[in-house]
Structures are given as structure tokens and as C-alpha cells.
């Protein structure tokens, strides 16, 4: 999630006639069991939702902007209806979950609005047998009293979704269906972008879903309540996981790129640029020369990092290890953009 980072036309100011058969969602096959669904939304977030099809359950990693379409003329704006009725070319022209034949299991990578908006997640929690999984790292962060703020819904003046988390995930928890059968998915706490951020390791397809922890060619944001120190720790953690999983070059290399760029920032090798957030509050911006990586956040977060001997020693040590270690590989990281 990153507000306004996709330069596209704004939503149409007036309603247009509905175009039959049109939708704001598009789906393509990522691998043997996983589909990537992109939502063309009016907030210009273009959230990516991942759908994994199992014999016993239909897993969704995030639920997007709830059909808040950029194009007001599209007919189908319900994610659930799209999954249950819309023919997908990469699925033999069949819907991904025809008629809702499989129960839904939703994993929230974090609680920002473009991952949980009312028209999305609420469609699934109202169904008997559906479950919602989220991080137990900081339960209060996801409480109904704080969610309007932590989700950023209040900043955009949009309704905060109402849903119950049925499964609070501890770090390293295995995801199971309602019968207790393992799905080959493991949830890891990766706080930093938000306290509740998680990554999901798919051991069958050898893919690591990183949520909004990192992007290519789009800013990585640090808003209020977020921490560059915790983020750095999570990047280091994911690098260790990738090595343990005998991860593929694209996964290991990109994580190393993010880690190295952050190191260059906190050691003064990258020039700071002044910018502002959507409320007009000042923030610092750091962009790699090729534009492939960018960090934005309150300058205090970066200064806090520089002042922490433990944080600086840890990231410096990882750079030394990177210079002396090469890993064999056979898996990949899935990025949200």
C-alpha cells in the first residue's frame, strides 16, 4: 500500500452507464495453485490480492479496496462475485471459486485500508465457515477503537470495515483449514511498515509473500506508529528465512538490495529530499539513483535508527555477511507491485 504512487487518471466525476460484463478486477495465474488478482481502484492503489485454491478451502491473501472502482461504469465490483461468477482465462474460462463451493480463509498482511476495505473483507466474514487470520504481534493496533486510525480510513474519510479476527497468528504459525489440515503456509511477523505486517511462506510453491514490506519502483512508506528499526529487523529476518529455505536468486538478491539501500541511507550515502504526506506533514524521502527503491517517512524514524547502536551494528553486520556469502536458490519473493 502506498497512497498515490500510481500515476493514473482520477476517477470519473460523474456516473457513466454500466458496461455489461465489465469488472474492476483482473486475474492471472501466478503458479500451479495461486492466482494474482489486481483491482483497478479509485484511490489509485492498484492492490494485488492473491488467491490460492485448495480442495478444502479458498485462501485469500488480502481483500483489496472493496470494489471502489476507478472506472464508475464497470458492472462487477464485488470481489466475492468476481471469484464466484467471473470466467478467468488462466483458469480455463471458469470462475476461481464457482458458486462459492469452497469456504474462505482470509489472511491479512496488514490493516491498511486498501487491504481490508468494507466492500472486500466484510463480504467473506459474513459467511459461515469463513476465517480471518492476522498477526498477534500487537492486538491493540487492530482493535475496533484504533482501526479507524491505523487503517488510515479516517484520513480518507471512508468507512472503517467491521470484522472479527478468528485466528490470531503467532510468529511462525502454520495455516490450517477448519478441519485442522495444514495448507503448507506459514505466517511470520514482519513489523515495520505497520506493527501487524506479516509475510507468508508457501512451502509448496516456494514463494514468500511480503505484503507491503517492500516494492520496486514505488515508495516504501513509514507512517505514524511505524518503525524503521523494526523494519530493518524484519528485512534481516526475511533474509535469514530465504537462506534457510534455500531461496532463489531473485528472492535473496532483492532482499539484499533493500537491506543495502537502507544501510546506505542510515550511513549518509543517500541524499535526503524533503516531501510531505497526504495531510501535508513533512517527511523525508530517499530514492536510489535508478528509481528502483524509495523510502519515505518522518525524519525522526531515520534519526532514531542512526542513534541506535544495536540497529546500526546489526545492519552493518548483514552487509559484511553479504560480501562474504553466496547462496544457492530455488524460490522467489512475491512483491505487491
Regions found by a protein language model. Name each.
Residues 26-30, 52, 171-180, 286:
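Short acidic-hydrophobic surface loop/beta-edge motif
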Residues 25, 39-41, 160, 164-166, ...:
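Short Gly/Pro-enriched turn/cap motifs at secondary-structure boundaries
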Residues 2-11, 16, 240-337:
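Accessory terminal helices/loops
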Residues 8-9, 30-36, 152-158, 180-185:
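Short Pro/Gly-enriched beta-strand edge/turn motifs at strand-loop
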Residues 1-17, 26-29, 106, 153:
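Short, basic/low-complexity N-terminal boundary segments at the transition from targeting/disordered tails
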Residues 20-95, 200-212:
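Conserved beta-strand hairpin/beta-sheet module of binuclear metal-dependent hydrolase folds
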Residues 67-181:
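Active-site HxH/HxHxD metal-binding segment of metal-dependent hydrolases
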Residues 58-60, 65-75, 180-279:
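Metallo-beta-lactamase
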Amino acid at each position: 500500500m502506498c497512497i498515490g504512487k500510481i500515476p493514473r487518471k482520477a476517477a470519473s466525476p460523474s456516473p457513466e452507464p454500466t458496461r455489461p460484463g465489465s469488472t474492476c478486477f483482473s486475474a492471472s495465474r501466478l503458479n500451479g495453485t495461486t492466482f494474482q488478482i489486481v483491482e483497478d481502484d479509485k484511490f489509485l492503489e492498484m492492490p494485488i490480492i492473491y488467491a490460492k485454491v485448495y480442495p478444502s478451502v479458498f485462501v485469500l491473501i488480502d481483500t483489496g479496496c472493496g470494489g471502489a472502482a476507478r472506472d464508475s461504469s464497470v458492472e462487477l465490483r464485488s470481489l466475492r462475485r468476481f471469484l464466484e461468477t467471473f470466467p478467468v482465462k488462466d483458469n480455463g474460462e471458469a470462475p476461481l471459486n464457482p458458486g462459492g463451493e469452497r469456504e474462505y480463509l482470509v489472511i491479512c498482511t496488514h490493516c491498511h485500508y486498501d487491504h481490508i476495505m468494507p466492500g472486500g473483507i466484510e463480504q467473506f466474514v459474513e459467511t459461515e465457515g469463513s476465517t480471518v487470520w492476522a498477526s498477534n504481534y500487537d492486538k491493540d493496533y487492530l482493535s475496533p477503537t484504533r482501526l479507524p486510525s491505523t487503517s488510515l480510513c479516517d484520513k480518507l474519510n471512508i468507512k472503517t470495515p467491521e470484522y472479527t479476527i478468528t485466528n490470531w497468528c503467532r510468529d511462525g504459525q502454520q495455516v490450517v483449514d477448519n478441519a485442522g489440515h495444514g495448507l503448507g503456509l506459514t505466517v511470520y511477523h514482519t513489523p515495520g511498515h505497520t506493527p501487524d505486517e506479516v509475510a507468508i511462506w508457501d512451502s509448496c510453491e516456494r514463494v514468500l509473500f511480503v505484503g507491503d514490506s517492500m516494492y520496486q519502483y514505488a515508495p516504501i512508506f513509514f507512517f505514524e506508529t511505524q518503525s524503521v528499526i523494526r523494519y530493518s529487523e524484519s528485512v534481516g529476518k526475511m533474509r535469514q528465512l530465504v537462506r534457510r529455505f534455500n531461496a532463489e536468486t531473485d528472492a535473496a538478491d532483492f532482499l539484499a538490495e533493500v537491506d543495502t539501500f537502507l544501510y546506505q541511507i542510515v550511513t549518509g550515502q543517500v541524499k535526503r529530499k524533503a516531501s510531505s504526506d497526504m495531510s501535508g506533514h513533512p517527511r523525508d524521502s530517499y530514492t536510489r539513483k535508478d528509481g528502483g527503491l524509495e523510502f519515505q517517512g518522518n525524519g525522526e524514524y531515520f534519526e532514531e535508527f542512526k542513534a541506535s547502536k544495536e540497529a546500526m551494528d546489526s545492519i552493518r553486520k548483514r552487509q559484511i555477511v553479504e560480501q562474504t556469502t553466496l547462496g544457492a536458490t530455488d524460490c522467489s519473493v512475491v512483491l505487491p507491485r
